[in-house]
Amino acid sequence: MTTSSYFLLVALGLLLYVCQSSFGSPHTSDSGTTLVRRRLCGSELVTYLGELCLGNRKRRGFPSMLKARAKRNEAFLLQRDGRGIVEDCCYNDCTDEKLKEYCHTLQG
């Protein structure tokens, strides 16, 4: 094995380790339910938030309304404890429970 292929193998191993630790296993809450932490940005964040706020109900036009708000930057100005949804769930990973805290702002 040459030095360059050994270096490549070590670099790949480190990359896999970093990815696994960044996106590792879901956390468990005190109640025993699994908390999936994820990072969502842009239209993916808007779409997921719309689906989460509606639950299983399908209301026509709601996701497109959210996308229109996102284009005007209103959806990203939502504040919770002095922080916005982008800081909470795009720059950092967050749970569905944290995302649900923004539902009342969008629907109200």
UniProtKB/Swiss-Prot annotation:
Q: What is the lineage of its organism?
A: Eukaryota, Metazoa, Spiralia, Lophotrochozoa, Mollusca
Task: Please explain the role this protein plays, according to its UniProt record.
Answer: This venom insulin, from a fish-hunting cone snail, facilitates prey capture by rapidly inducing hypoglycemic shock. It is one of the smallest known insulin found in nature and lacks the C-terminal segment of the B chain that, in human insulin, mediates engagement of the insulin receptor (INSR) and assembly of the hormone's hexameric storage form. Despite lacking this segment, it both binds and activates human insulin receptor (long isoform (HIR-B)) with a moderate potency (EC(50)=30.45 nM).
Under the cellular component aspect of Gene Ontology, which terms does the record hold? extracellular region
Q: Which domain of life is it from?
A: Eukaryota
Q: PROSITE patterns attached here?
A: INSULIN
Localization recorded for this chain is:
Secreted
Give the protein name, as stated in the record.
Answer: Con-Ins K1
Q: Which residues carry this modification: 4-carboxyglutamate?
A: 44, 87
Residue(s) carrying Glutamine amide: 107
- The record's disulfide annotation reads 41-90, 53-103, 89-94
| Family label | Belongs to the insulin family.
Q: Which UniProt keywords apply?
A: Amidation, Carbohydrate metabolism, Cleavage on pair of basic residues, Disulfide bond, Gamma-carboxyglutamic acid, Glucose metabolism, Hormone, Secreted, Signal, Toxin
